[in-house]
């Protein structure tokens, strides 16, 4: 199974990007970040964040 450190909450992702949770949700909606829905909460895949940074830096 997936270890906890491989997925981040929207809040943790926002902190990592130094942005707002609203912006993170927008990125998920735009499919800029790979995320999975867990109940009513989004979980962002850490691997996807690293990919995003590599493409955008």
Predicted regions mapped to residue ranges:
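Polyanion-binding surface elements
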Residues: 1-23
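Short helix-start
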Residues: 8-10, 34-57
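Major-groove DNA-recognition helix of helix-turn-helix-type DNA-binding domains
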Residues: 16-43
